[in-house]
Swiss-Prot record:
NCBIfam families per UniProt: PRK05610.1 (NF004123), uS17_bact (TIGR03635)
Taxonomic source organism: Nitrosospira multiformis (strain ATCC 25196 / NCIMB 11849 / C 71)
Protein name: Small ribosomal subunit protein uS17
Subunit-level organization: Part of the 30S ribosomal subunit.
Entry keyword Secreted: no
GO cellular component, one term: cytosolic small ribosomal subunit
Single annotated GO MF: structural constituent of ribosome
GO BP term (any one): translation
Gene3D superfamilies attached to this UniProt entry: Nucleic acid-binding proteins
Lineage of producing organism: Bacteria, Pseudomonadati, Pseudomonadota, Betaproteobacteria, Nitrosomonadales
Alphabetized InterPro entries for the sequence: NA-bd_OB-fold, Ribosomal_uS17, Ribosomal_uS17_bact/chlr, Ribosomal_uS17_CS
Amino acid sequence: MSEANLNRTLSGKVVSDKMNKTITVLVERKVKHPLYGKIMVRSKKYHVHDEANEFHTGDVVVIEECRPLSKTKAWRVVKLMQKAEQVS
């Protein structure tokens, strides 16, 4: 069994790029309330490894799980889905 197929992937929006080689990605998911059936938005922030400091706030990225890189960082960026809009 190959380990490459076992890594989980998520997509989310970069909300912070102030750390060196680390970005914070906000991942949102929709869940149905078990009793009332209302669709709710749940979110979680992940610290993600960005080796070249190439991703910035507002970018939409795909991340995948990897070995622990620090106390709070166990995800890395796979690819850029959408670049943030530049406001001039």
